[in-house]
């Protein structure tokens, strides 16, 4: 079902880095646990297995074919199913975390080793994998820049938007789901719909969908759809509605189980033709890949960052996930040169896009970031308009098979 790919050289997760006008706060925040859990992510490194936390995939129950069920109804049904399975093994229902029924069928759960050994033999279970921390981090050898928040004196068209032939104003009904750290809903350059969004966090400073405590998701959203409004920057599909799906907290940290919950929400609520961007990733997860493939199979086009490890993208999830509606994106610079940090490999990579020194929106202003996290939303914006075209080849692709540069 999936493109084959190897594990990362080290369990680092990928995203963009700050190289421009703003530096984000990364203070420890222990007040934003994943729903149903009590995880303090600061205790873990990116890619670490979270002790005692698991993602259970169930054998098909047929719930996905019951089109009459709303997202809330599916959630209730799967929570009942999960609770009944746990009670069968005398496991407390409070151990049950996120539940999934719109993409994969299953749930997140806390288990002792003894409970894991017992429940894993149940015939209703297809697979169990360890939950992991997922966190944003810089490409190898890079680090965050410094500086204060900034605004642009007048509207600019970033070089990446020009390179992919974006910037036209979108007036249709398609929506862009940004599966990330949230989006600053007050930003004057973005058309944000929080009422359609999802938040994996239920308390602390990350519980509000109106804010983005990290800034990464707001930057991604601006590349997709910043308005043509005489200020700031212009996105690839200017003015498109961007929807926050907050699965990363203010430190840029979350869990695989929370990311799957976000994907599950989008699968249940998006319309065929909508798009989604996932500028995040980590070690291989069959459950995460399966959820993303299910989302793509519903008609939602998904842009995925290839990763920043200078590694084969086949070693990472969800970058390795394969479907006709999935586009895995590597990064180039303003001279079309393949970025030194970018992951590579065909498959899974479908296109390259600008990902070095990308100016976009951040809470309170604008900043330049680098990473495949910045390349992916260029293609996400293109997918609003249709399938990307061929704008030439990336220069110096290390796999010897140059990635096509995506354009409208």
Please name every model-derived segment.
Residues 2-3, 8-11, 16-48, 139-148:
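Bacterial Sec-dependent N-terminal signal peptides
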Residues 43-92:
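Post-signal-peptide N-terminal segment of Sec-exported extracytoplasmic proteins
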Residues 57-61, 99, 111-112, 129-133, ...:
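Active-site-proximal beta-strand/loop segments in catalytic clefts of secreted hydrolases
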Residues 87-153:
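Autoinhibitory propeptides
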Residues 138-143, 233-234, 253-259, 278-350, ...:
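Substrate-binding/specificity loop regions of serine endopeptidase catalytic domains
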Residues 142-241, 258-261, 265-274, 327, ...:
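Active-site core segment of subtilase-fold serine proteases
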Residues 221-224, 374-389:
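Short, small-residue alpha-helix embedded
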Residues 234-237, 244, 268-291, 298-300, ...:
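C-terminal subdomain of the subtilisin-like protease fold in secreted/lumenal serine endopeptidases
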């Amino acid at each position: 079902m999936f493109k084959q790919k190897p594990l990362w050289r080290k369990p680092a997760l990928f995203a963009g880095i700050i190289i421009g006008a703003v530096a984000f706060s990364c203070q420890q925040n222990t007040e934003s646990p994943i729903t149903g859990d009590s995880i303090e992510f600061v205790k873990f490194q990116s890619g670490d297995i979270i002790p005692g936390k698991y993602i259970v995939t169930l054998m098909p129950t047929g719930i996905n074919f019951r089109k009459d069920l709303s997202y809330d109804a599916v959630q209730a049904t799967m929570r009942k199913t999960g609770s009944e399975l746990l009670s069968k093994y005398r496991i407390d229902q409070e151990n049950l975390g996120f539940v999934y029924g719109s993409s994969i069928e299953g749930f997140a759960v806390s288990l002792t080793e003894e409970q894991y050994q017992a429940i894993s033999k149940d015939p209703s279970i297809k697979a169990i994998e360890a939950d992991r921390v997922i966190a944003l981090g810089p490409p190898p050898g890079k680090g965050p820049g410094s500086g204060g928040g900034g605004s642009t004196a007048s509207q600019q068209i970033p070089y990446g938007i020009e390179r992919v032939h974006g910037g036209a104003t979108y007036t249709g009904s398609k929506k862009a789901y940004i599966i990330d750290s949230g989006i600053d809903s007050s930003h004057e350059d973005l058309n944000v719909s929080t009422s359609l969004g999802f938040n994996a966090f239920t308390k602390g400073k990350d519980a509000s969908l109106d804010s983005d405590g990290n800034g990464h998701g707001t930057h991604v959203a601006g590349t997709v759809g910043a308005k043509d409004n005489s200020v700031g920057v212009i996105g690839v599909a200017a003015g498109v509605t961007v929807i926050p799906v907050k699965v990363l907290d203010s430190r840029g940290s979350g869990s695989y189980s929370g990311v799957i919950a976000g994907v599950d929400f989008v699968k249940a609520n998006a319309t065929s033709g909508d798009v989604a961007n996932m500028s995040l990733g980590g070690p291989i997860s069959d459950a995460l890949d399966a959820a993303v493939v299910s989302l793509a199979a519903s008609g939602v086009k998904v842009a995925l960052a290839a990763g920043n490890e200078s590694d084969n993208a086949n070693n990472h999830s969800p970058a390795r996930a394969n479907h006709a509606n999935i586009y895995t994106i590597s990064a180039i610079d303003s001279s079309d040169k393949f970025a030194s940090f970018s992951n590579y490999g065909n498959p899974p990579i479908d296109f390259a896009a600008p990902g070095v020194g990308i100016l976009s929106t951040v809470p309170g202003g604008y900043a330049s970031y680098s990473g495949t996290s910045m390349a992916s939303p260029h293609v996400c914006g293109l997918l609003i308009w249709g399938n990307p075209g061929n704008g030439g080849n990336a220069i110096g692709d290390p796999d010897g098979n140059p990635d096509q540069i995506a354009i409208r």
